Amino acid sequence: MHLLMSLFGVLAVMQQQLAVRAAAYIPDSDRNTKTLQNDLQVERDGNYRYAYETSNGISATQEGLGGVSVQGGSSYTSPEGSVISVSYVADETGYHPVGDHIPKVPDYILRALEYIRAHPYQVKDYYTGELKTVAHDAAAFNVYTRNIQDQTTPRSRPSSTPKTIYLTHPPTLSDAPTRRPLRQRQNDSRRR
């Protein structure tokens, strides 16, 4: 038992030493890194701009428009030696990164989105009972395909396609179908 406790103690000390060494590890390429450029401009209206670059190849720039939109980019060198670059725009439609290392949207997904956009469908209006044609908004479709490069581009929507229909109020109880009581089964002569 004493031997087992000693073994656990030695293992705990070794694990602690390895954790300290792993946390203190800094690759040789990063050990003597210098900041080559560091610029920051902040204006009273909320607009800002920053850029930095280090001697080990890491760089970033970003420009913000008063909390409404941001655009920028960054790059670094991967452990394999290739330069990884990302440029992006973030605005009311979301975050849109662009980079060679980011997977492209498969062609079959683009074709499916195009088919959905090009084929409006009909919905029965709950209140009036009439059929209304609903089309997908081209602007929403463009958000999905904004940053797709070297892929098929969506065709513009024909001007005859109707706009999206939105119902203006929630259903009320008077619009709901009426309830009917369930009929009770009569004694069936087959069941005995």
Curated annotation (Swiss-Prot):
Residues 149-163 have a biased composition (Polar residues). Residues 1-15 form the signal peptide. InterPro entries: CHIT_BIND_RR_consensus, Cuticle_Struct_Prot, Insect_cuticle. Residues 149-192 are annotated as: Disordered. Disulfide bonds: none annotated. The keyword Signal applies. Residues 45-106 form the Chitin-binding type R&R domain. Keywords: Cuticle, Signal. One of its GO terms (molecular function) is structural constituent of chitin-based larval cuticle. It holds the Pfam family Chitin_bind_4. One of its GO terms (cellular component) is chitin-based extracellular matrix. Component of the cuticle of the pupa of fruit fly. PANTHER family: CUTICLE PROTEIN, CUTICULAR PROTEIN 65AU, ISOFORM A-RELATED. This is Pupal cuticle protein. It comes from Drosophila pseudoobscura pseudoobscura. The lineage of its organism: Eukaryota, Metazoa, Ecdysozoa, Arthropoda, Hexapoda.
